């Protein structure tokens, strides 16, 4: 048994909430299609892969990292601001 305190969040909303994303989680998540880093789009509540031109939804505080669930980015998305790196 470990003497270290439990660092596990008690609630998924701690990691992805309406006002931001935990940067520690964003550092370890990658796009399943390209294996490249993701950016958090606060306005749409999605994780964006600029290289794959896909946006992965976050539902109930849980990122859905499945390509078939991702939204295709249009020509104006993925190049402008709106996301966090």
UniProtKB/Swiss-Prot annotation:
Q: Which PANTHER family match?
A: PROTEIN PREY, MITOCHONDRIAL, ZGC:162634
Family annotation (InterPro entries): Trm112-like
Q: Which organism is it from?
A: Hyphomonas neptunium (strain ATCC 15444)
Which family would the database say this protein is a member of? Belongs to the UPF0434 family.
Protein name from the UniProt record: UPF0434 protein HNE_3545
GO CC terms on record? cytosol
Q: Which Gene3D superfamilies match?
A: 2.20.25.10
Taxonomic lineage of this organism?
Bacteria, Pseudomonadati, Pseudomonadota, Alphaproteobacteria, Hyphomonadales
Q: Which Pfam families match?
A: Trm112p (PF03966)
């Amino acid at each position: 048994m470990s003497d270290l305190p439990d660092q596990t969040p008690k609630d998924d909303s701690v990691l992805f909430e309406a006002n931001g994303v935990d940067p520690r989680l964003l550092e370890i998540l990658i796009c399943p299609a390209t294996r490249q880093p993701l950016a958090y789009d606060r306005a749409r509540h999605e994780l964006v892969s600029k290289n794959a031109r896909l946006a992965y939804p976050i539902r109930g505080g849980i990122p859905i990292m499945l390509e078939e669930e991702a939204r295709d980015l249009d020509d104006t998305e993925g190049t402008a601001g709106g996301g966090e790196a």
